[in-house]
Amino acid sequence: MKPKNNKIQIASFDDTTVVGINSALVDYKLACSINNKLSLDLARYDDLVFEGAPFSFFYYTAGENYNVYNLVSLVCKDKVLFPFKPRLDYLFLIQNTLSPERQINIMRSLREVEGIAHAFVLEKDKNLRQVLETIADCEQQMINKKKKQNDINTIREKMRKQEEELVALRAQSS
């Protein structure tokens, strides 16, 4: 059997830093520890589903033109999203360019988190395209869902104001 070529160039993800994390911490504890150490606000979103297995997904954006952070579980019970050597439990993704100093500081901070055995930057020639594309799709779905919810909230607020105005008009005419 011919071995698979695990090298895929990730041209569209050049500004993404991919950190492999080995940790026995459960997802929410790891996210909380990373939040505390890096002053982030990673929040749990809908799981990424591959081959029927849910893999936890955490998301945080520091605002427009800033970094976007994701924490993705690579293990769900007996399923593995992507096998890596050495074994990884999570991917921590940082979108948008980081200065070398900022990357060093983030890596130092991650390695100081109690419960993280190893954290290292993965080379972009690893077989990451599928997971990065899936995460990008998931983010877009979240943005669309949030926008739709904001639109619904705006409509509700307008309706509430119109109802208040109608009540006030009825009170004046009485």
Predicted regions: what they are:
Residues 44, 80-86, 115-124:
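Conserved short beta-strand edge segments in small beta-sheet-based binding/regulatory domains
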Residues 33-37, 104-112:
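Short amphipathic alpha-helices in soluble, non-transmembrane regions
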Residues 6-27:
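Terminal, regulation- and interaction-focused segments at domain boundaries
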Residues 108-174:
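Glycine-rich, aromatic-bearing surface loops/beta-hairpins
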Residues 42-45, 49-53, 68-71, 75, ...:
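Acidic, serine/threonine-rich, charge-biased low-complexity segments
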